[in-house]
């Protein structure tokens, strides 16, 4: 299930434990979905014997995959009502649009923020608010470049509806891209998630859309960089 973010006010260790924590902090952990992608090239490198080029290629591939599937700790803001970015990346769109039809929320346009993830960004997705998962729907589709506006409507996607304790609804949509052909979503209907929890991953370039209640004031602009689980996109009234 989702991995919890580091809560604010977590006590710090001292002595040897502090040194170990510093080393761990400098090397982001690996998302479980990336283990096969790292283990296979490592095994090839070990089995390469005297073939140096094979060993180097295996190690380089393992390192690249470890970087792609990195899963750094994040500390969400400790403020009520905030909606944080569900992913690292660059804000591609700040507009209004109808939520995915498969969620059955109607066609009324809602405030939306679209975040584009390049292959160099962290590719885990994090819960934008604390709440209960009311719906999770997968929709098959195309694999156009995720930075195109029409990608929200035509590309393969996975949509999740969250309901906060106050009854407000937030929709977050994982969208596959030109290279991304695999969407991972660990959240299930009925799960209770906390803001900043890791709930999924999209492999190799993608986009994540967040839909907000009507009237929500968005606090970000296109071109702005986001940090998943930390950057505030909006504050719910």
From Swiss-Prot:
GO annotation, cellular component aspect: plasma membrane
Coiled-coil blocks: none
The protein's name in its UniProt record: Phosphatidylserine decarboxylase proenzyme
Keyword Transmembrane set for record: no
Alphabetically ordered keywords of this record: Cell membrane, Decarboxylase, Lipid biosynthesis, Lipid metabolism, Lyase, Membrane, Phospholipid biosynthesis, Phospholipid metabolism, Pyruvate, Zymogen
Post-translational modification: Is synthesized initially as an inactive proenzyme. Formation of the active enzyme involves a self-maturation process in which the active site pyruvoyl group is generated from an internal serine residue via an autocatalytic post-translational modification. Two non-identical subunits are generated from the proenzyme in this reaction, and the pyruvate is formed at the N-terminus of the alpha chain, which is derived from the carboxyl end of the proenzyme.
InterPro entries tied to this protein: PS_Dcarbxylase, PSD-A
Pathway: Phospholipid metabolism; phosphatidylethanolamine biosynthesis; phosphatidylethanolamine from CDP-diacylglycerol: step 2/2
Assigned protein family: Belongs to the phosphatidylserine decarboxylase family. PSD-A subfamily.
Entry cofactors: pyruvate
Protein purpose: Catalyzes the formation of phosphatidylethanolamine (PtdEtn) from phosphatidylserine (PtdSer).
GO BP term, example: phosphatidylethanolamine biosynthetic process
EC number: 4.1.1.65
Presence of keyword Cell membrane: yes
Site (Cleavage (non-hydrolytic)): 205-206
Post-translational modification Pyruvic acid (Ser), affected residues: 206
Residue numbers annotated as active site: 206
Catalytic activity: a 1,2-diacyl-sn-glycero-3-phospho-L-serine + H(+) = a 1,2-diacyl-sn-glycero-3-phosphoethanolamine + CO2
Membrane topology: Peripheral membrane protein
MF terms in GO: phosphatidylserine decarboxylase activity
UniProt subunit comment: Heterodimer of a large membrane-associated beta subunit and a small pyruvoyl-containing alpha subunit.
Cofactor note: Binds 1 pyruvoyl group covalently per subunit.
Subcellular location, record wording: Cell membrane
């Amino acid at each position: 299930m989702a991995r919890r973010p580091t809560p604010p006010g977590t006590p710090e260790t001292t002595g040897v434990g502090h040194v170990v924590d510093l080393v761990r902090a400098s090397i982001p952990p690996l998302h479980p979905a990336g283990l096969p992608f790292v283990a296979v090239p490592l095994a090839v490198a070990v089995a390469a014997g005297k073939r140096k080029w094979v060993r180097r290629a295996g190690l380089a591939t393992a390192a690249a995959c470890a970087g792609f599937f990195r899963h750094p700790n994040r500390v969400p803001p400790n403020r009520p009502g905030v909606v944080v970015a569900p992913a690292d990346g660059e804000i591609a769109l700040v507009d209004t649009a109808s939520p995915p039809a498969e969620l059955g929320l109607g066609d009324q346009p809602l405030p939306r923020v679209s975040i584009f993830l390049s292959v160099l960004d962290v590719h885990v997705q994090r819960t934008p608010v604390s709440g209960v998962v009311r719906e999770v729907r997968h929709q098959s589709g195309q694999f156009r470049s995720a930075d195109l506006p029409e990608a929200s409507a035509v590309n393969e996607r996975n949509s999740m509806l969250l309901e906060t304790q106050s009854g407000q609804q937030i929709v977050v949509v994982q969208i596959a891209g030109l290279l991304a052909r695999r969407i991972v979503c660990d959240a299930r209907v009925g799960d209770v998630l906390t803001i900043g929890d890791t709930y999924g991953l999209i492999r190799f370039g993608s986009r994540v859309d967040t839909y907000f209640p009507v009237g929500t004031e968005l606090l970000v602009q296109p071109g702005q960089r986001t940090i998943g689980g930390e950057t505030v996109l909006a504050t719910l009234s």
